[in-house]
């Protein structure tokens, strides 16, 4: 049995030792990952595991789903920690739905507009990064797909249906401006972080 089938306080308290051991192992792995990533991205070298990991309890105040706990463990590794709007590295560990992601999502309008302007101003460099063979084979093309069993990889979680406000409607590479996030992800085996 796991938290997905038993998402209630009584079950959780009866299995708290298992959670504590699992959480400790997860945090140890994230600490190692920070060390590895900091070798090619020194902006995150100062982070601690607490800067990056999310709480296991859910905020249910405005949700119709009152399940008290998340079904996964997650960490966002970026220069300003898990609450940052900067791009970074996301780790999501959930039975049958483990994945790794890069980029940024849930961006406020002003930052999303700045990203779109930056892409337009540097479209050749942008395309050389997101249209190269290795990137496309790993993550795909902009597709606004939710992660799940049917989507083992993706580039972009949400896209606008039309041109964003104040951008030219006839822009040749509109698919990049319609993106509401710049997040690329790939599903990995649940055992990916073991060992």
Please provide the spans of the model-predicted regions:
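Residue-level preference for alpha-helix termini and adjacent loops
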Residues: 10, 18, 55, 61, ...
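Short, charged low-complexity intrinsically disordered segments located at boundaries
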Residues: 27-33, 60-69, 146-149, 165-167, ...
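Hydrophobic/aromatic-rich structural module bridging two neighboring secondary-structure elements via a short loop
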Residues: 38-88
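Charged, low-complexity intrinsically disordered regions
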Residues: 87-195
